[in-house]
Amino acid sequence: DYVLISSSAVYPETLPQPFNERQPIGKNSIWGDYSSGKVGAEVCLTSRYPNAYVIRPPYLYGPMQNLYREPFVFECAELKRKFYIPGDGEMKLLFFHVEDLCRFIYSILKQHPDNHIFNVGNTQPVSISTFAELCYRAAGAPLEKVFVKDHPNQRDYFSFHNYEYLLDVSLQNEIMPEQKDLYCGLKESYEWYKSNKEEVRKKPYIDFIDRNFQ
């Protein structure tokens, strides 16, 4: 059996949401070359092995996360910094724990479902404001929020694109209806982060905040 861990970035941002597995795939301008690469990988694999399984996750998280996404929030929490949140904080993010990803791969290899393309992800999205609250809570730190209303590029100071999208994960839920609680997963992520900070690929968000928002 072939299983490709693709990405929800294969859905062009212009498609109706929530994205579902029946929609056409193509380049998403938010994700650029990353999106194009994932689309190309899907086309290549499925043209050669039509019975391969393709899995399209949203933001993956959990222990061994070396991208400076939730680790950025953890660092701010440890430093007891205010946390700068884009807009009104209501933009939604969709996550999926790496352990749930592994459980799902195991399930499809064991069950061999008729469907071969699956969106995966938590059933419920979370606002960026609530996400910050959960990360600070996982780190055991109080949170003071600052909402940024007038800066054009949130990636200067925040670790997620200004892009909200939702996935239809009903096919996933027929096979694996339960996902790890987001707070519990973030707590696991923080425990890994504490001992592995040197593994994280940092970006200069804090420097930008100190130079522009203080």
Each PLM stretch: what is its role?
Residues 153-178, 196-198:
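Conserved C-terminal active-site "lid" loop/helix of NAD(P)H-dependent oxidoreductases
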Residues 182-214:
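Amphipathic terminal alpha-helices
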Residues 51-93, 135-136:
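NAD(P)-dependent short-chain dehydrogenase/reductase
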Residues 74-84, 91-126, 133:
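Alpha-helical substrate-binding/gating segment
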Residues 107-157, 206, 213:
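Mid/C-terminal beta-alpha module of Rossmann-like enzyme folds, strongest
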Residues 29-55, 69:
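Active-site Tyr-X1-5-Lys
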Residues 62, 86-91, 118-126, 150, ...:
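Glycine-rich Rossmann NAD(P)(H)-binding loop
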Residues 7-32:
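Active-site "gating" loop of Rossmann-like NAD(P)-dependent oxidoreductase/epimerase domains
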